[in-house]
UniProtKB/Swiss-Prot annotation:
Gene from which this protein is expressed: clpP
Gene3D superfamilies: 2-enoyl-CoA Hydratase, Chain A, domain 1
Principal localisation: cytoplasm
Protein name listed in UniProt: ATP-dependent Clp protease proteolytic subunit
A Pfam family that the UniProt record links to this protein: CLP_protease
GO molecular function terms noted in the UniProt entry: ATP-dependent peptidase activity; ATPase binding; serine-type endopeptidase activity
Coiled coil location: none
GO annotations of cellular component type: cytoplasm; endopeptidase Clp complex
Signal peptide: none
Active-site annotation: 98, 123
Compartments, as annotated in UniProt: Cytoplasm
Amino acid sequence: MALVPIVVEQTSKGERSYDIYSRLLKERIIFLTGQVEDHMANLIVAQMLFLEAEDPEKDIYLYINSPGGVVTAGLAIYDTMNFIKPDVATLCTGQACSMGAFLLSGGAKGKRFALPNARVMIHQPLGGARGQATDIQIQAQEILKLKEMLTRKMAEHSGQPFEKVAADTERDNFMSAVEAMEYGLIDKVLTHRDIK
């Protein structure tokens, strides 16, 4: 199990200690790190809903460093980002690949960022099926529907034509932060802090 740093704050009532992620949550910062999967998605959704309840007018900051993961788990996060009232600003630190890139591009327009050495990778969804031929056919149809929907949404977020995004996601397509900005997946490369 990884150790999580603890920070201590002085208050009028004495000292209070927080794990670093809880302290950053007070600043409306959520970390999406590692593989996107159901448990992690549920925690991120819960944090977004909590922050909306705390203040529906203030932005939420989603810091992403992820190789991607389960499409349906990522869509739970994506749908919540769009469902809640606060804008969700996204910031790539390290990498945003696959579903990580999709979530990065799905941040509020004008509030999608990456650090200078971040890497972004887009591709079509991955899947595998086993079982009877009919079951494999059902799975294939489902992944094709997901591919079409994800491509359409990424085209919408990037401003690129659907056909271009479809072609560009046929294989792993790696981009620097500047290339991701030129493609329309992010709005700005941050070289110094100018957001909270």
